Structures are given as C-alpha cells and as structure tokens.
C-alpha cells in the first residue's frame, strides 16, 4: 500500500572506513558535555509518522494537538502560532492525513517543531468521515499517552484506507474495535471459551468482560447480550456477510466498549446510531 510505504520509511545506514595506519583515539569529551548531548538527543524526535486525532485552542494563537504516532504512541503537542492566518501549520495539521511530525521537550505536552504532509491517502467523506471521527474518539479514550502500539497504528491506517475506498462501514468498524481492544490490553479471543473449549456454531454464549466467552446457560447477568457461536466464529475471522453476525456483533461491541469505558458515552457513537445505526 502506498500509504504504508510512506509511513514505514527505514533509517539511513551509516558506514565508516579505516586507514591502513591506525590513528590515535580522539580524547573523550568532558563528562558535562556528554550528559548535555544525551539530554538533547533524548528530548528531540524528528519526522515521526503520525496522525492528528483532535486539536483545541491554546492561548490566543496556538493549538494543543492530540496525535497518534507510530513509535511513541499517543502524545499531546503544542503547535505554537498555528492559529495565525499565515501559519504554515494551519493547512498541515488536518485529521485523517498522514504526517511526519517533529517535536522537542520532556513534559506531558511537547512542543511541535515541524510538520510535513506525506500524502498518498484519499480524503474521507460522508459516512466514512463520521466513522473516522468515531475511530479517533476511541483512540483518545483507550490509548494511554506514550504507550507505543505500532500494530494499532498500522491498523488505523488500514481503517482509514478502507473507509476512503467505500468499504462497508459496519465491517470496518467492528474490525477496528476488536484490534483496538486487543492492543490496549483487553483479551478478545472469540473462538474458545474460558473453559478452553472450542466455540460451537449452534450454541449460545455470552462474553464476560473480565474473562471471555462463557456458555449462556451459566449463571450470568441478565444484561449481558446472548450471541451465537457462529457470530463469535465469524468475528474471529473478520467475516460479516451474515445478517445475524452484523446485528449481534454490533450489540456485543457496544456492550464491551461501554463496559470498559465505565459507562462514559461516546459522542460520535450516538451520532452514528442516530444516522446509520452503525
């Protein structure tokens, strides 16, 4: 995929040669100078693949930008002067577009020092745009700051690409939700029960948010949604061509997300429910 090529550029290789006659080793720099150099390199990051998740005003002319980066996880960056009319950052810090970001600092909010648009990704529109905002809100809610998750970053890129190409939103969102929960520490094995038995297509099950798949015949809370084994197996294979799987997977994921968020509502989820019942 062109986008992945742009977002996974490799580091330059550095080679060194040697003269026939050995040269004396250069003197070591003073201790103080070495420590200062280490601090500078540790607190600067250059051209990191990233996406803007959300931004909001900061003081009169700046923005706080919530970003998802490939190798550093989710970060907050202050974009100084980004609200000024002629700021070069105004047209670059857009959601759903691949960027290369540079920043410095070690505090909770770093300072953005550079932003470059990578390109190669179609813009989102219509339902795809709403789904993109929904994915962004989930990332903000579930991803702790400074917790690198390259597989989740890569699946986010895939999600945006699929939405931009008009793939069915239901399938794209369920796939993203599952990867998000898995990569943020919530077990999502759907083909085996907590008793280590294989899920059977014709049986009825529930998903215990703390443990996993259980038989629906067990003594379980009445508000847990009951789902068929076929739905669980379809979800495990990312297969949503059955109408029953579409309906039951939506109910299950809504239940799990609400549980893991402690009942905190998702603004974009309600919009999607109202408009498209996604």
From Swiss-Prot:
Pfam family for this entry, one: RecO_N
Bias type Polar residues, positions: 1-12
InterPro entries xref list: ARFGAP/RecO, DNA_rep/recomb_RecO_N, NA-bd_OB-fold, RecO, RecO_C
GO biological process: DNA recombination; double-strand break repair
Swiss-Prot/TrEMBL keywords: DNA damage, DNA recombination, DNA repair
GO cellular component annotations of the record: bacterial nucleoid
Disulfide bonds: none
Region entry Disordered, spans: 1-41
Family: Belongs to the RecO family.
PANTHER family tied to this protein: DNA REPAIR PROTEIN RECO
Function comment: Involved in DNA repair and RecF pathway recombination.
Database matches in NCBIfam families: reco
HAMAP family: RecO (MF_00201)
Protein name, per record: DNA repair protein RecO
Species of provenance: Burkholderia orbicola (strain AU 1054)
Gene: recO
């Amino acid at each position: 995929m062109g986008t992945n090529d742009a977002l996974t550029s490799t580091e330059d290789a550095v080679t060194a040669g040697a003269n026939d006659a050995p040269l004396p080793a250069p003197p070591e720099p003073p201790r103080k100078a070495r420590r200062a150099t280490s601090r500078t390199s540790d607190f600067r990051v250059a051209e990191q693949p990233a996406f803007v998740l959300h931004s909001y005003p900061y003081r009169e002319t700046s923005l706080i930008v919530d970003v998802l980066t490939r190798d550093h996880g989710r970060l907050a960056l202050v974009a100084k002067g980004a609200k000024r009319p002629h700021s070069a950052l105004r047209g670059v810090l857009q959601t759903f577009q691949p960027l290369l970001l540079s920043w410095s600092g070690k505090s909770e909010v770093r300072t953005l020092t550079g932003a470059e648009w990578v390109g190669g990704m179609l813009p989102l529109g219509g339902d795809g745009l709403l789904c993109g905002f929904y994915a962004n809100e989930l990332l903000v809610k579930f991803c702790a700051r400074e917790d690198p998750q390259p597989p989740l970053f890569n699946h986010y890129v895939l999600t945006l690409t699929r939405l931009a190409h008009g793939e069915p939103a239901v399938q794209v969102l369920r796939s993203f939700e599952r990867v998000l929960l898995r990569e943020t520490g919530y077990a999502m094995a759907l083909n085996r029960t907590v008793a280590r038995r294989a899920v059977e297509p014709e049986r009825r099950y529930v998903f215990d948010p703390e443990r996993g798949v259980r038989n629906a015949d067990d003594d379980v809370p009445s508000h847990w949604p009951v789902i068929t084994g076929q739905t669980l197996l379809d979800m495990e294979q990312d297969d949503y061509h059955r109408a029953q799987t579409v309906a039951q997977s939506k109910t299950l994921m809504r239940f799990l997300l609400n549980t893991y968020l402690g009942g905190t509502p998702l603004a974009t989820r309600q919009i999607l429910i109202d408009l498209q019942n996604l």
